[in-house]
Design a protein with these regions (language model features):
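Helix-loop-helix "hairpin" substructures at the membrane interface of multi-pass membrane proteins
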Residues: 152-223
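Membrane-interfacial amphipathic/re-entrant helices at transmembrane-helix boundaries
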Residues: 2-30
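Short, amphipathic alpha-helical interaction segments positioned at domain boundaries
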Residues: 365-398
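Short acidic, hydrophobic short linear motifs in intrinsically disordered regions
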Residues: 322-334
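Short loop segments and helix-boundary regions at transmembrane helix junctions
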Residues: 36-127, 234-245, 262-266
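Transmembrane helix-bundle core of multi-pass membrane transporters
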Residues: 111-170
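Transmembrane alpha-helical segments in multi-pass inner-membrane proteins
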Residues: 212-267
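Short amphipathic alpha-helical interaction segments
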Residues: 334-350
Length: 398
């Protein structure tokens, strides 16, 4: 097969390059959808367990059919993925270990069983453990789907395309049930949606997705595509539909950017895509507006300052003596460092809560009102009392 060459605005690509990116995009979208629900259910590690433990299913399927292209391999691998989930839950329900420990016990055992089966009984067969882990997208376009001599394109693209269509169809049919069972299993049962059925349905889709992407991209990239985009989206929004779209967007971007990074530095395509996914998540983790590390640290710093301000205002409210309201009192009696005292005073002046005359601090009318409302909020915890303060003060935003 002689590759065709395409040129778009001086960017020259051969047909295998386009097909590699299409396969990566389809895999990214197919992984992002179940990945969102796994992250929301705090089951991110289960995707790693499934991606490794399906190996025995593939090997057993090959022993039965002697055909690496048989659909039975996919079915048995998906079944092995479900068995993994059941085993993890059985161990977890004993109460002796937590979920992450149960996962750590189950998937290495199943994966090693698969490796031993290959080593002992399938040495002459193309079942490469390294390819299972890392995949090799560069070769995916050369495994073609041929029907009656007609070349229909890369087999991986068709397999993952079918998996993606099934995933999207199930998402549309059961979106409401998935949403309710994810956030409130009790309400789901009350409304007649079995959370157990939804749970194992999600696990089945996750298993089939992992199996479908297994040969093309490898276990490591599948896990990265399931978890990293969803985790990044989780830090950016609380809306489920937006989270799905953002997760898909991150996955597609990482697939394309990762391919061109690999092309630029002559490295593993799957490894480069996983690296880009890590960089994307790190960027969101640091700079997300509400949940990012920098935003959280800034908010905590502001809240500490505002707690100090509120403490100072309560002190002023309780003391009318000038010596108790003198600026020097901040350092001597409240035991604040000079920088902290200056920061608190500046915040109070900025919000017109205090005035300073001859280094004696007094509450303004607004300061008196603020202090009384804050006290009432502390006692009653009724949000309506401090609703108008939330725009100016981190302290009351929760």
């Amino acid at each position: 097969m002689r590759p065709r060459i395409y040129s778009i605005n001086k960017l020259t690509m051969t047909s295998p390059q386009i097909e590699i990116q299409l396969i990566a995009i389809v895999v990214a979208v197919a992984c992002a959808i179940p990945g969102v629900f796994l992250v929301l259910r705090k089951m991110a590690l289960i995707s790693d367990a499934i991606s490794h433990s399906i190996l025995p299913g593939i090997v057993i399927g090959f022993f039965i059919t002697q055909d690496l292209n048989s659909p039975l391999l996919i079915l048995l691998a998906a079944l092995t993925g479900l068995i993994t989930v059941v085993l993890v839950e059985m161990i977890q329900k004993t109460g002796l270990v937590k979920e992450d420990t149960a996962i750590g016990l189950v998937f290495p055992s199943l994966f090693s069983i698969g490796v031993i089966m290959i080593a002992k009984n399938a040495n002459d067969v193309h079942l490469d453990v390294d390819a299972v882990l890392l995949g090799e997208l560069a070769f995916a376009p050369f495994d073609r789907l041929l029907i009656s001599g007609m070349d229909l394109g890369p087999k991986s693209l068709w397999v993952m395309g079918v998996v993606l269509l099934i995933t999207i169809l199930l998402l549309f049919l059961f979106f409401k049930e998935l949403k309710v069972s994810t956030f409130d299993a009790g309400l789901s049962s009350a409304l007649g949606f079995s959370p157990v059925v939804m749970h194992y349905g999600l696990m089945s889709v996750s298993s089939i997705t992992v199996v479908g992407a297994f040969d093309a991209v490898g276990a490591i990239l599948v896990v990265a595509l399931m978890i990293a985009p969803a985790a990044a989206a989780y830090l950016l929004t609380n809306d489920l539909k937006k989270m799905l779209w953002i997760s898909i967007g991150f996955g597609v971007f990482s697939a394309i950017a990762g391919y061109w990074l690999a092309h630029l530095i002559d490295a593993s395509i799957s490894g480069s895509m996983t690296t880009v996914l890590g960089i994307v998540f790190l960027g969101v983790y640091l700079f997300a507006p509400r949940k990012g590390l920098i935003a959280v640290l800034y908010r905590q710093r502001q809240q500490r300052t505002e707690v100090s301000l509120l403490t100072f205002l309560l002190h002023l409210n309780n003391h009318s003596e000038e010596n108790e309201r003198h600026l020097n009192h901040l350092n001597e009696h409240i035991n604040w460092q000079k920088v902290r005292a200056e920061t608190v005073v500046e915040l109070g002046l900025k919000n017109n809560l205090i005035t300073i005359e001859k280094e004696v601090v007094s509450l303004t009318e607004k300061g008196n009102e603020f202090t009384n409302l804050a006290l009432e909020y502390i006692i009653t915890n009724r949000d309506e009392k401090i609703e108008h303060m939330k725009d100016d003060f981190f302290l009351f935003r929760g």
